C-alpha cells in the first residue's frame, strides 16, 4: 500500500545556499517539525511519498492508496483547515491523522474549533480506513477535544511519533545510565522566543549555562530566531536585532552579541544531523519539546520547561521529564539539571511500548505495514488484533 504523507519537508536540500526564509518555510515554520516528519517517514518506508498541503488531490489519488497526515496542535481557534478538508474530500482516499494536538491556555479547558477545522475533523473521521480509530492524538486532553467536537470513537492516544524514532527497545536504560552519572559538562538549549516574556529570566539562566559549558543555543522558530542562528543580520531590522539581544544577552554590545551567536547559536536542517549533534552533549533543557525529544532519541538526558497545555500534555503522555516554567528556581547551574528533571526510566519504557502498540495497531488496521524498527518497540503480548482494513473510502459529501 502506497502512502501519501501530508507533511513539511524532511530536510532542506542545499540549505547552505538557501535563504533563511526558504529554510523556515520548508520546515513548516518550525524546524522541530523535522522530528516527527523524520519519524513518520522511517515508520512508513519504503512505500511512502511526501506531499505538501497544497498538493493536487487527483495526484495523490493517482499515486497513492491512503493519506497519512503529520499533524501538530491544529485543534484550536488559531487554525482553519477548510482548504485541506476540501482537498481530502476530493482525494477520496482513506485517511489517518497522526500526532494531533489541542492548544489551550490550560489542560481541562474546552477548545473551540473554527468551522474550517471542524469540517476537516469530520472529513478525516468519515474517511477512516477501518472500523477502528484513525486519529492519533498527543494525549488524553486532545482526545477529549476530538470527542467534544463530535467524533467520539475516532481518536486514540498515541503521543508523538518522534518518541519512537530510535528503534532500540532499551533506549530508556541508555538515557538512565547517562542521567545517573550526573556529570553535566556540556549543555544544549532548544531556544524559546524573544517575545515569551514569562520565560525571559529562565532563558537567560539557560543561556549562561550554554556559555559556561561551550554549549549550543538551538533556534527552531520564528524566522528571526533562524536568522540569528545563521548570522543573517542583513535581513533583520535594528529593532528586531535589539529585541533579540536584549532577550538573549542584554549585557553585550551589538558586536559582542553577533560574536556570541557565531559561537553558540545554531539551527538544524534535518532530524538526523540534529540527533547526531546531540550525542556529544550531557544534557538538553529548554522550552521546546522536539528539541528535547531529539536529544533523548540520541540517548542524551533532557528536560522540557513547559509554558502551555500542548507541551505539558505531550510530556505527561510520554513520561518526558518536565517542569512548568513557574516551578523553575530563579537560579540554577548545569550540575542541577539532572535533579531538576528526574527521569523515570521504567515508566518511560513501559509507556513508550504501550504507545508503540497503539500506533502499530492503527497503522495495521489501515493496511499499512509498519517498519521493522517500529515493530521492535512493541510488546506483542499487549497488542490488540488488527481490524480488517478497507481498500478505499467511498466519496464523502461535503461536511458542514
Language-model features, listed with the residues they occupy:
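Active-site anion-handling motifs in enzyme catalytic cores
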Residues: 1-400
